[in-house]
Swiss-Prot record:
Family classification: Belongs to the chorismate synthase family.
Co-factor binding comment: Reduced FMN (FMNH(2)).
Cofactor dependence: FMNH2
GO biological process: amino acid biosynthetic process; aromatic amino acid family biosynthetic process; chorismate biosynthetic process
GO MF, one annotated term: chorismate synthase activity
NCBIfam families given in the database record: aroC (TIGR00033), PRK05382.1 (NF003793)
Gene3D superfamilies: Chorismate synthase AroC
EC assignment: 4.2.3.5
Reactions this protein catalyses: 5-O-(1-carboxyvinyl)-3-phosphoshikimate = chorismate + phosphate
Xref: Pfam families: Chorismate_synt (PF01264)
Binding site for FMN: 126-128, 285, 300-304, 327
Lineage: Archaea, Thermoproteota, Thermoprotei, Sulfolobales, Sulfolobaceae
Annotated protein name in UniProt: Chorismate synthase
Length: 390
């Protein structure tokens, strides 16, 4: 099964299945000298961890173990292997799935591709969102390394089902980590919570849209024509389980506008040139402009639901119904925000290393100190959130 790696210089390879012994990631291309601890990884993993209100009831502690690539609290430049054990697995929930593939899920395509006898049906196996633990762990390293340029990444759940959020500034989006449903304001949070409760009672689920904003990104990232930053961001985001769409800046809204409406005036901003409204979402010509990068992605409703759905019994070939048991997110988009943040970070740090914005081989001591100071400031901004979700 190829296709488990992402990136060129900062390259990750995730491994593991939903109900296997563990999941994890190998991260290659991290410069030597970056200060890195288990706490750094746990901090980011806490925001996607299940077992909390409004998300999956699967109670995983998600404690990362760094196996290689770090010595005396600093990266050595060699591959960093991280493993997270699966500790709350109940495979008996999936006995019916073994003979009745779930509508909307990857069950039947995996059978078609790899053969029924090779299919790990337990919790979705490799197609499960449990795989994203490795992405978020690697994303923590990427986010920290981006502090070299004082680049911050934050995300929120912009919409859930029929409920949309009002516009929000970066601080509001950053503080959405306080929200159990990743909402950026109290009124929207209450509406999101009501929808999730409703879906849970009905045995159903909702889709949503995540919005990710990158503050102070380096200008000049992206390599036309086939390695445009927008193309790599799209690939990164669309690789996330349950994601069905991607846009940046005005996105699909631009298709309904005139050029005079969609174009953004170039203006002087202090000692540099910039754009008045950042309608392009920080990307033009496939290259970052230095303005905030704004991307959005849509998540479909969670496929595994209790409400009966039509399928086929693989034993008989006859029509059948399935009501999926187990512990599933009523809205996978809630925890998907953290995964989307991580994929944006992984894309940007890879391009930063490729372009030389970040030293690709080693960090000087002063550079490592500055990164650490900025990272601690970021963690303190979000600290109440991490504690409230533990």
């Amino acid at each position: 099964m190829p296709g488990n790696s992402f990136g060129k210089i900062f390259r990750i390879t995730t491994f593991g299945e939903s109900h296997g012994p563990a999941v994890g990631v190998v991260v290659d291309g991290v410069p030597a000298g970056l200060r890195l601890s288990q706490e750094d990884l746990e901090f980011e993993l806490s925001f996607r961890r299940p077992g909390r209100l409004y998300v999956s009831g699967r109670r995983e502690k998600d404690v990362p173990e760094i196996l290689s690539g770090v010595y005396n609290g600093r990266t050595t430049g060699s591959p960093i292997a991280i493993v997270v054990k699966n500790t709350d697995v109940i495979s008996s929930f999936y006995e019916e799935v073994k003979v009745k593939p779930r509508p909307g899920h990857a069950d039947l395509p995996f059978i078609m591709r790899y053969g029924y006898e090779n299919w790990d049906y337990r919790g979705g196996g490799r197609s499960s969102a449990r795989e994203t633990v490795g992405r978020v762990a690697a994303g923590a390293i990427a986010k920290k390394l981006l502090m070299f340029h004082d680049t911050w990444i934050a995300g929120r759940l912009k919409s859930l089902g029929p409920v949309d959020s009002p516009p929000a500034d970066f601080l509001q989006i950053l503080c959405s980590k306080y929200s159990p449903v990743r909402a950026s304001d109290p009124e929207t949070e209450a509406k999101f919570q009501e929808l999730v409760k409703q879906a849970t009672v009905e045995g159903d689920s909702y889709g949503g849209v995540a919005e990710i904003v990158v503050k102070n990104p380096p200008a000049g990232l992206g390599e036309p024509v086939f390695d445009k930053i927008k193309a790599d961001l799209a690939k990164a985001i669309l690789s996330i389980p349950a994601v069905t769409g991607f846009e940046y800046g005005l996105g699909f809204q631009a298709s309904r506008m005139k050029g005079s409406e969609a174009n953004d005036s170039i203006v002087r901003k202090g000692e540099r040139l910039g754009w008045r409204e950042n309608k392009s979402g920080g990307i033009l010509g496939g290259i970052t402009t230095g303005e905030d990068i704004v991307v959005r992605c849509s998540f479909k409703p969670t496929s595994s639901i209790r409400k009966p759905q039509g399928t086929v019994d693989l034993r008989t070939g006859e029509p059948a119904e399935i009501s999926v048991l187990g512990r599933h997110d009523p809205a996978v988009a809630i925890r998907g925000v953290s995964v989307a943040e991580s994929m944006v970070a992984l894309t940007l740090v890879d391009h930063s290393l490729r372009s030389g914005v970040i030293p690709p081989v080693k960090l000087e001591e002063r550079q490592a100190e500055v990164i650490e100071d900025r990272w601690r400031r970021y963690m303190e901004e979000c600290r109440p959130t991490a504690e409230s979700q533990s």
